[in-house]
From Swiss-Prot:
It comes from Chlorobium chlorochromatii (strain CaD3). One of its GO terms (biological process) is base-excision repair. Belongs to the DNA glycosylase MPG family. InterPro entries: Formyl_transferase-like_C_sf (IPR011034), MPG (IPR003180), MPG_sf (IPR036995). GO terms for molecular function: alkylbase DNA N-glycosylase activity; DNA binding. Keywords: DNA damage, DNA repair, Hydrolase. This is Putative 3-methyladenine DNA glycosylase. PANTHER family: DNA-3-METHYLADENINE GLYCOSYLASE (PTHR10429:SF0). It holds the Pfam family Pur_DNA_glyco. It comes from the Bacteria. SUPFAM superfamilies: FMT C-terminal domain-like. Its EC number is 3.2.2.-.
Length: 203
């Protein structure tokens, strides 16, 4: 698996939510174990015009990472229980990020099962909190990049537009009308939960 170049991430946040679908997120642990998952669900968050985005009101120490180079990891703790994995987008100094909502496990399955304390395959990474637990992603990963060797996204065939679903984002109370959740339709690893807006294909 070869890492995607920096140029891949140099696009709008909305475009990146679709481009990332089907690509492989990889983490190489210090002991050499490789963990990999196919990205099957994403959500866009923008600093401008999006009240659900952490950077909507202002730049703060907490959201500072969102203003960095596209391809930087923005990891935060939420609900007192889960870490969320985001990939920074947009040009530097303009906040934006793609939340990785779900993956399909590809490599390192046994490690993931131990991390998640479950052997149920479809349940290993079928949600943003589940996938970070499976990948052992925590606060120390915040600010890392996809270009330093430990983390990267590998290329894979693009998902045809008629196989991409779109809907409102899950688990938010503001800007719910924005159709910025993208997912591979029919994939068993896409997360559940209450959806804001209508689910449809992009065709």
């Amino acid at each position: 698996m070869e890492p995607l170049p920096k140029q891949f991430y140099q696009c709008s946040t909305i475009e990146l939510t679709e481009k990332l679908l089907g690509k492989c997120f990889v983490r190489i642990l210090p002991n050499g174990t490789r963990l990999a998952g196919r990205i099957v669900e994403t959500e866009a968050y923008l600093g401008e015009g999006d009240e659900a985005c952490h950077a909507w009101r202002s730049r703060t120490p907490r959201n500072e990472i969102m203003f960095r180079e596209a391809g930087t990891l923005y990891v935060y703790f939420t609900y007192g229980a889960h870490y969320m994995l985001n990939i920074v987008s947009e040009p530097e100094e303009r906040a934006g990020a793609v939340l990785i909502r779900a993956m399909e496990p590809l490599e390192g399955i046994e490690f993931m099962q131990q991390q998640r304390n479950t052997t149920k395959f479809p349940n290993l990474m079928s949600g943003p909190g589940k996938l970070t637990q499976a990948l052992a992603i925590e606060r120390s990963c915040n600010g890392r990049t996809l270009f330093d060797g430990e983390f990267f996204v590998a290329d894979a065939p693009a998902i045809p537009s008629h196989q991409i679903g779109t809907s409102g984002r899950i688990g938010i109370s503001r800007s719910t009308e924005l159709p910025w959740r993208k997912f591979i339709m029919g994939n068993a690893h896409v997360s559940g939960g209450k959806v804001g807006g209508v689910v449809s294909s992009l065709q």
